[in-house]
Amino acid sequence: MPLRDKYCQTDHHHHGCCEPVYILEPGDPPLLQQPVQTSKSGIQQIIECFRSGTKQLKHILLKDVDTIFECKLCRSLFRGLPNLITHKKFYCPPSLQMDDNLPDVNDKQSQAISDLLEAIYPRVDKREYIIKLEPIETNQNAVFQYISRTDNPAEVTESSSTPEQTEVQIQETSSEQLKAVPDADTEVEEAIEPPSIETVVDEAAAPTEEQPQESQADLETSDSSDLGHQLICCLCRKEFNSRRGVRRHIRKVHKKKMEELKKYIETRKTPNQSSKGRSKSVLVSLSRSCPVCCKSFATKANVRRHFDEVHRGLRRDSITPDIATKPGQPLFLDSASPKKSFKTRKQKSSKAEYNLTACKCLLCKRKYSSQIMLKRHMQIVHKITLSGANSKREKGPNNTANSSEVKVELADSVESSPPSITHSPQNELKGTNHSNEKKNTPATQKNKVKQDSESPKSASPSAAGGQQKTRKPKLSAGFDFKQLYCKLCKRQFTSKQNLTKHIELHTDGNNIYVKFYKCPLCTYETRRKRDVIRHITVVHKKSSRYLGKITASLEIRAIKKPIDFVLNKVAKRGPSREEAKHNDSKQDGTSNSPSKKYEVADVGIEVKVTKNFSLHRCNKCGKAFAKKTYLEHHKKTHKANATNSPEGNKTKGRSTRSKALV
C-alpha cells in the first residue's frame, strides 16, 4: 500500500500524490482535492485578503489560523519564526545577499511587508492642521492658539502658546473635541513668534498661586456648561464641559495622581466667548472638597459623610462652616479662653448630645432608623459609648446634667459605695439584700448631689436621685461593679467595659432580665441554647435534621424572666437545704459537722421524663443527669466547693451550667 505523500500543496511535482489510492480515507474534501490556484500566492495572497477581504475572512486569518513556514529550498516546515530564521541562517542561507545598511525602497518584498502592515493595522489618515493665533488685549507677551483641521475647520482646539504643548493638543483632538470657536475678525493666520519659555512658566505659575487664596471662598459651581461655567485645566489651559473629561485629561496627559486632580481644576464663567470675556473671566475653585485629602464630591452632604466616616478622629471644625453643617444651621465652635476651658467642658458635657427616643444625634443633626444605628454612630464618630440601661432615657432641658452622668452612674457611683450584697454568701436571703441596698442608697445619693451642684443647670438633688433609686438597686442586685462580677451568670470580667457590654445582654430598656430557652417537646428550660439542643438529642432522641428545623425557633421561643426569679431561686434553696440538713441530722443522730450534713442531704432524686426514660436530679443545684454515675461525679464538685469560703467563690470567676428545674 503506498504511503501518503507529505509534499507542499502549492508545488505540483506529481510524485504520486495524484495517483489513485487503494484505501480511501474519509475526511474533509478540501484535504483530498487538489489546491486551487488564485491570482496571488504566498504572503501576497494574505495581503490581498486583508485589503479587500470581508470582515469574517480577516477574523479567520487573525484569530482562527496558525501559520506554518516552509523553506522553499529544502521544503522543511516550521511552526515558529525563530526556528525558521535559525534554519535559514545555518542550513539554507538565502540565495540573495542583501545589504542591511542600504535598504532598497523600491524592493517588492519591502513594499509587500509595508502593505501587509498597512492592511492589518490601518493608521489614521494624516491630517493637516492650521494654527490660528488670537492676540490678548491685556497681555502682549501671550496669545491664544487655536488648532483646526483643514478638512473640518469647525472643529477648533484651544491651546497655549508653547510649541511643546501644541503637539500634545494635536494628539488629543481625535479623542476630545471642544466647541470654543473664536471670532473670525480677530483671527490672525500669519506666523507669530512664540514668546520665551520664562514668560510661559510665569503664566502657568500665576493661576496656581491664586488658587489656594480663592479656595477659601464658598462659590457654588455646576457640572454642566448650561449655567455658564466651563472647567479649565490649569496646566495647559484647556477647556472642558464636564468634570469627568478634565479629570481624565489630567490623569492621562499630565500623569498626575488622583489625589492631586483637584489642584489643577478651575472653573470659569463664560458669558460670551469674545476676547474681552476671556480677559475678564473669573476663576473659581471647587468648594465641595475634603480639606484633609482634597477629594472632590458632588454635594456638601457627601463631604460631611466622607469626613465622618473616613477622618473619624478629626472634628468637623476643620471643615469650613458652610460644609460642616446643613443649610440654615450655624456651626458652634469653641472660642473660649484657657481660663474658662474647665467650665466649657462641663457645660459641653451637660448639653444634650443625643435623643434615643427620636433616634437623633444632636451633635451632627442626623436621624437614624433605630437606636442600634444611633449607638453605633455615637461610638464610631463621636467616641461616646451608650450603655443599654439608659437606652430609653430622654434628654430634656431640666435633666441634662443628670443625663450626662448616666454612663458614670453605672460604674463610678457604685464603686464609691459598693453594696454589701457583693460580700454576702451566695445563699443569702433576698430580704437582707434589699435591706443592705437601702442602707447604701443615701451615700450614693450624696455623691450624686455633689456632682449635680457643680453644674449651673443641674436639677434638684431629690429629682436627680429619684430616677437613680429605681435603677441602681436593680443593677447592684445583679452585678458587682467593684469585683466586675455578674451574679446572674456567675462570670467575672477583666474590665468595666466588658462588664458594661455584658449588662446590655441582660437589659431591655429599663428592665433587667435573664433569658431562658425552652424545649419544644417538654417543660425543660435552660439558660444555654446548646443545653436544649443536647437535651433534645439525648432525651428525645431526635435526628440532626429535626434539630436544624428547631434551632431557628429556639430564639423565638425564648422567655425573658426577671432577675428576681433567679435570685429568689437561690434564696429559697438556702433555708430549704438547711432545714433538710437539720431534719436529717436529727433523725440519724449524727453530729452537726458540715461534711456529714452534706452527705446526708445529698441524695439524688429520680425524675421520670418519659415512660422509659428518667433523669437523676441533684437536690443541691437542681441539675439533672441521664446516668447515676454522672450525678455521683457531680456531687464531688459540691464537696470540693463546700470546703472553700462563699466569699472566695464569689470573687473567683466561674463558668457554671444552667440550673433549671425539670
Curated annotation (Swiss-Prot):
Cross-link type Glycyl lysine isopeptide (Lys-Gly) (interchain with G-Cter in SUMO2), residue numbers: 132, 280, 392, 474, 597
Gene3D superfamilies the record matches: Classic Zinc Finger
BP terms from Gene Ontology: acinar cell differentiation; endocrine pancreas development
Molecular function in Gene Ontology: DNA binding; zinc ion binding
Residues modified to Phosphoserine: 318, 337, 420, 424, 453, 455, 458, 460
S-S pairs: none
Ranges of Polar residues composition bias in the record: 414-434
Biased composition (Low complexity): 205-216, 456-468
First and last residues of each zinc finger (C2H2-type): 69-91, 231-254, 288-311, 357-382, 484-506, 517-540, 616-638
Chain intervals for the UniProt region annotation (Disordered): 172-197, 205-224, 319-349, 389-473, 573-597, 633-662
Classification via PROSITE patterns: ZINC_FINGER_C2H2_1, ZINC_FINGER_C2H2_2
Biased composition, class Basic and acidic residues, residue ranges: 575-587
Keyword Transcription regulation: yes
Localization terms from the record: Nucleus
SMART domains: ZnF_C2H2
SUPFAM superfamilies: beta-beta-alpha zinc fingers
Chain's role: May be involved in transcriptional regulation.
Similarity remark: Belongs to the krueppel C2H2-type zinc-finger protein family.
Protein name in UniProt: Zinc finger protein 800
Source organism per UniProt: Mus musculus
